[in-house]
Amino acid sequence: MTIPSSAPQQQGPARGVQWAKRLLGVCAAGCVVAVLAACGSSSPKTPSTSSGSAATSSSAAAPASLSQLKTMVLQPADLPSGWKGAPYQPNPNDSATNAAMVKCVGGRNSDGDKVAEAHSDDFALGDASISSSATSYRSQSDLESDVAMLHSPKLSPCFEQMMKKQLAASLPAGGTVKSASVKITPGSAGGPANVVATGTGTIKVQVNGQQIPVYLTVAFITGPLIQAEVDTENVGTPLPASVVNPLVATVAARAVKG
């Protein structure tokens, strides 16, 4: 999503919320994608057992094709009533964002091991949005290093640093990033076993004299030579778990089958 470089003509709280909604696109398309890309660029080490049966079954699997991955991501029928989908729009800054994240965390870039990548529509309802993606890789070692990366103590602070820098450059004139916090937690958080980590983030921006909180979540999912994710963003309040958890479970169930 493109963020205009100049301040909008309309002023007041309503316009501030509109800017916050646009910032969701910046962070979803750049920050969360960069975390996953950096996870795919980590130095291999023994993964946590939280990767479960997905890591074990992938040793004999063939990488999923694009057509297979498209069936794993969220479909319009998966969303509750009222959510409207729009085609995924790639962010032209993804490569630069990924490079910055890799440099911060440390590791090798394994983008060359990607076989295919699919994205769902970007689903929206009011100030909230939900999206998902699934990527296949050539080897089991890619998944093992990625799961290990999610345990790195550098991951959350590097994500925060990158997010603040990216958002600061995207705000309208006079806008400021008051705070940004991100926490990546290994494990399924009580969800499906192939959810290997979850992340939450809170961004507070001040636009047109109004301070607005933006909330993010991400679920990191594995399958046979597959990495998938479900991302959510909302202005003002986090999306309820009653909405998010079933969607994560749906993608996880598809990914684990490969």
Annotate each PLM feature.
Residues 229-258:
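Surface-exposed amphipathic alpha-helical segments
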Residues 1-37:
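Sec-dependent bacterial lipoprotein signal peptides
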Residues 48-126, 248-258:
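Extracytoplasmic low-complexity, Pro/Thr/Ser/Ala/Gly-rich segments
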